[in-house]
Amino acid sequence: SAASDVYKRQGVAVLGAAYYFLRKIPYTGRIAVWFTGITLAVCILFCLVNIKISKCIAFYGGWDCGMVANSARWLYEGQTLGYDDYYTIYSNNIPVTWLLYQLYSFASGLKGYPYNPEFIWIQFQCVMLSLAVFCSVLLVLQVSRNLGISVIALVFQSIFLGISPWKIIPYTDGSTIAMPILILLLYSLFRKNGRKRKYLLWFLIMFLGCLGGIMKATCYVTLIAVVLVDLVWSAWEEVPMRKRLQKTGLKILLL
């Protein structure tokens, strides 16, 4: 409609103006800390709004997400899953079933929890969505060092992930949605940190990649991409071959 077109143009104009003025602000450590704090506050608000919306649109899903949700409830009730062919075929759903069971048990034992224990699954996924937005914006800030681009990233990430239906579906997609971008953010920090922190960051990258990968193969894809890119970077470094091989060997050992 004509009204919606006007709103779209106004939104684009506001974003364009924000980008124009913010890109002129010089990037400093203080500015980065300030912007990170604002982004964190926006992401917390984003999480609370998502939880509020989810209370109005939540429903029971079928197919795989229904299977893992039912299994989590059965485990809490003391039932056994037996030798179900489902988990033999889709073994990647075993970890997410265990995760949902732990969350369900926590909510059930929490005095004064105001919702059905199953709602904690949705709350957890809203937190993961907010973490994905936060990590995405920080990654853009790290790479671009430009506040204008980072603000645009914050707006678009909030919109696109805000309308994501996965927040109300307790399944692997929502539970691991922040993992790939978190891995990329850690690798960006890895490239910029000194020697002492590098191997700790590398270990975290490998750990999170494998932790997410047992539930969603996308995390393995991200991890493989990071390793390949790092091998290329290592090949370009102007250091003696022996030192280069030692660093590569230690990274492989951590992997």
Functional labels for PLM-detected ranges:
Residues 2-7:
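Short, small-residue-biased leader/transition segments that mark boundaries at the very start
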Residues 52-69, 221, 247-255:
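Juxtamembrane membrane-water interface segments immediately following transmembrane helices
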Residues 67-71, 86-119, 123-127:
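Short hydrophobic/aromatic helix or loop-helix immediately within or flanking a transmembrane segment
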Residues 131-159:
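Transmembrane-helix signature of polytopic, membrane-embedded enzymes
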Residues 144, 181-201:
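Membrane-interface transmembrane helices that cradle and orient dolichyl/undecaprenyl
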Residues 166-176:
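Short acidic/glycine- and proline-prone juxtamembrane loop motifs at membrane-interface regions
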Residues 199-217, 227-228:
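Membrane-interface alpha helices of multi-pass inner-membrane proteins
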Residues 222-254:
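Perimembrane helix-loop-helix junctions
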